[in-house]
Amino acid sequence: DLEKTKNSFDLAKEFAKKLGKDKKIILFVGTKKEAKDLTERAAKELKMPFVKERWIGGTLTNFKQIKGRIDHLNDLKKKRETGELDKYTKKERLQIERKIEKMEIYFGGLAENLKFLPSAVLVVDSKHEKITVKEANQTKIPVVALLNSDCDPSGVNYPVPGNDNSRTSISYFLSEFAKSYKEGIILAEQESATADKPAKEQPLVINH
């Protein structure tokens, strides 16, 4: 039903616009092969955190521990950049380098932009990402999802029916969502500029 799909997508885009206006963080999740690079690209475009490899259980429900892993990764990368790792032996440096590489696979997409729990989670294929959806539900985080029409939309606040196996469909879903988020940012800037503008002086009227 095209009309139903359009209405669902309009609701999701309106939500994206509101998130953009309020400068909220969205966690993008797309771990199936058709979605990995597209998910990463859309998230990076908005400077948002993303997961494109295996979802690490507890990313939302045990965020404090996950945040500790992210901080550790960022600390190691910083030490590598500043040359602090030079004091270690060649063998030790190699071990640390391997550790960074391994952590990058699972936490690299979260390292820069996930300082606290996100305000929304966007998933490509809610059936494939059912653990993510479950964790989002447990932590009361709204879920936006592209899902096949035969998928169970329960647990998804903004379901968008579509072909979640088609790269064209996934790309369109992600780019439209990102576009709406950007529209929200522009809207906030316009409202801010209007609020900052001094009120136009009214002519002085003297009643005789």
Model-derived regions: residue spans:
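Ribosome large-subunit tunnel/peptidyl-transferase-proximal elements
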Residues: 1-163, 167-193
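Intrinsically disordered, low-complexity mixed-charge segments
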Residues: 184-208
